[in-house]
């Protein structure tokens, strides 16, 4: 929560008075698909990302009259080396690439999607490939009970 949520809140509170004084600004927040859905083994991370969505959805409405925009990037799997260093429940790095991340969107394509979304002023763009995570986002919006029944089956054996 300290990094994935509170750091955004502290920085936003520092910048907001300047944006309001200028009557312009654009907050671009990097969240995650986990900010919209919950999957097994990711409860703390998902909680922080859900908190980001709630905070910045509210802020968007509060500052719209001051010409301040809020974009919440919602990336899926992006091909990076993050899983090599991601902490496991025993505080050691995973030390190996995640198959999902290895098959994720290359970083250069992710950057292009991000820049396009910022230029368009998108509220909450999905960044990534058309894949299971995008389908999960649709399911949680259109038929939340379906994903709730599928989620327990995602626990690694």
Each PLM stretch: what is its role?
Residues 12, 48:
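Active-site helix of classical SDR
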Residues 37-44, 59:
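Active-site loop immediately N-terminal to the catalytic Tyr-X3-Lys motif
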Residues 32:
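Residue(s) in the substrate-gating loop at a strand-loop-helix junction
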Residues 122-157:
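A transmembrane-helix-recognition feature enriched in membrane-embedded lipid enzymes
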Residues 14-23:
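A short helix-coil junction within the Rossmann-fold of NAD(P)-dependent oxidoreductases
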Residues 65-131:
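SDR active-site lid
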Residues 17, 61-64:
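Alpha-helical segment proximal to the catalytic Tyr-Lys
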């Amino acid at each position: 929560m300290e990094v994935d949520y509170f750091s955004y809140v502290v920085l936003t509170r520092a910048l907001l008075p300047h944006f309001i004084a200028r009557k312009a600004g654009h907050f671009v927040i990097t969240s995650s698909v986990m900010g919209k859905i919950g999957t097994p083994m990711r409860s703390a991370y998902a909680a922080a990302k859900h908190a980001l969505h709630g905070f910045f959805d509210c802020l968007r409405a509060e500052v719209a009259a001051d010409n301040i925009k809020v974009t919440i990037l919602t990336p899926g799997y992006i091909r990076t080396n993050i899983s090599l260093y991601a902490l496991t429940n025993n505080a050691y790095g995973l030390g190996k690439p995640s198959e999902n991340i290895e098959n994720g969107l290359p970083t250069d394509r992710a950057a292009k999607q991000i820049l396009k979304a910022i230029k368009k002023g998108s509220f909450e763009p999905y960044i990534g490939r058309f894949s299971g995570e995008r389908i999960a986002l649709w399911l949680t919006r259109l038929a939340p009970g379906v994903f709730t029944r599928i989620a327990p089956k995602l626990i690694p054996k």
